[in-house]
Amino acid sequence: MNDRSANLSMPSADTVPHPYVLEATGISKSFVQGGLNVTVLNNAQLSVRRGEKLAIVGASGSGKSTLLHVLGGLDDPSAGQVSVMGKPFTRLSERERNDLRNRALGFVYQFHHLLPEFSALDNVAMPLRIRRMSTEAARREALAVLERVGMGHRAKHRPGELSGGERQRVAIARALVTKPACVLADEPTGNLDGGTADTVFNLMLELSQTLETSFVIVTHDPELAGRCDRIMRLRDGVLHEEPPVPV
């Protein structure tokens, strides 16, 4: 392993030791739809340890994406609290929440959301540039992560010149470049063919172990979910722990 890869093994978000990187207690979320109050989340609870891989499964429309948005501070719960690295995420000011989110959380989506006019390198460097890191330093860090996900040789290519699997690898690199404690992934393999999905999922599992980064992964694929440490099913707004899948 080269020096740049070695630097990735020290997550910067672990500034204060805490048993859980992410906790949610009593999370409820309701929407008004057609004049009716629709409850999507009802007293949902979960906790995620450092380096743990948690799969969230459930029927389409059950509220899995809404749950991730609440966990990531992108949406406010109607009730309940989310804590990140032991800090009361949902009680912080918007500025404090944004700062903690940028330091402790990463995001991966089904559609990569890469900026088409920028190279893979500059897409991955973007979160660091937002932190006001110099262009040179940000690109150096970004290249190290791209090499880690097997995309160093494609760093100068734009998203339109990459395959679906390659674009998702770049998206994973972008999520990891800030060395987050936890990555929230919403159907990260849902837009990929079976073989490519398996490769990308294996990459996330490997990075979770080697970097001690937690992953909360929403997926419809029971086989992929079974390779995580734990599975929780969202049903009627409530999270239920699933029994371990036999290996």
UniProtKB/Swiss-Prot annotation:
Question: Which SMART domains does the annotation name?
Answer: AAA
Keyword tRNA-binding among record annotations:
no
Query: How does the entry describe its membrane topology?
Result: Peripheral membrane protein
Q: Which cysteines are joined by disulfide bonds?
A: none
GO BP terms in the entry:
lipoprotein localization to outer membrane; protein localization to outer membrane
In this chain, ATP is annotated as bound at: G58, A59, S60, G61, S62, G63, K64, S65
Q: In this record, what's one Pfam family?
A: ABC_tran
Q: Name one GO molecular function term.
A: transmembrane transporter activity
Cellular component annotations (GO), alphabetically ordered: plasma membrane
Does the keyword field hold ATP-binding? Answer: yes
Q: Which domain of life is it from?
A: Bacteria
Q: InterPro entries from the entry?
A: AAA+_ATPase, ABC_transporter-like_ATP-bd, ABC_transporter-like_CS, ABC_transpr_LolD-like, LolD_lipo_ATP-bd, MacB-like_ATP-bd, P-loop_NTPase
Q: What is its EC number?
A: 7.6.2.-
Q: Which residues form the ABC transporter domain?
A: 22-247
Keywords from the named record: ATP-binding, Cell inner membrane, Cell membrane, Membrane, Nucleotide-binding, Translocase, Transport
Q: Where does the record place it?
A: Cell inner membrane
Role according to the record: Part of the ABC transporter complex LolCDE involved in the translocation of mature outer membrane-directed lipoproteins, from the inner membrane to the periplasmic chaperone, LolA. Responsible for the formation of the LolA-lipoprotein complex in an ATP-dependent manner.
**Which family is it part of?**
Belongs to the ABC transporter superfamily. Lipoprotein translocase (TC 3.A.1.125) family.
State the oligomer form and interacting partners: The complex is composed of two ATP-binding proteins (LolD) and two transmembrane proteins (LolC and LolE).
Q: Which PANTHER family match?
A: IMPORT ATP-BINDING PROTEIN, LIPOPROTEIN-RELEASING SYSTEM ATP-BINDING PROTEIN LOLD
* Descriptive protein name: Lipoprotein-releasing system ATP-binding protein LolD
Organism of derivation: Paraburkholderia xenovorans (strain LB400)
